[in-house]
């Protein structure tokens, strides 16, 4: 069962990446990243350093659903949950961004940061192509 769902996710992600490549060439992505970095030059803290220096060592995860359990909380607000994790002692955050299988979104990471989260953030997705990096 687990192998089947993993293969299904990978196959789906390959199709999704192909569509993204057609809609947004890699050269455009590089330009956007350069522009974003110029606007926000501050660096996120190191995840390993944050974990080693913390009392908890906890990487708290934001996930709306899972392939095995279905919807956990369809209406969870990334800003509220991640700030609550930060306030309650998490060392770092893991944010699921896959939409179809985990109910995530790429924008969840920027929304968490814009809401005041200062912890290191792990962008969690299935990477099947260099284009995604």
Regions found by a protein language model. Give the residues of each.
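Glycine-rich beta-to-alpha transition loops that act as phosphate-gripper elements at the mouths
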Residues: 61-65, 72-76, 102, 123-131
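Alpha/beta enzyme core
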Residues: 72-96, 115-116, 131-133
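Alpha-helical segments flanking ligand/cofactor-binding loops in enzyme cores
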Residues: 7, 79-83, 110
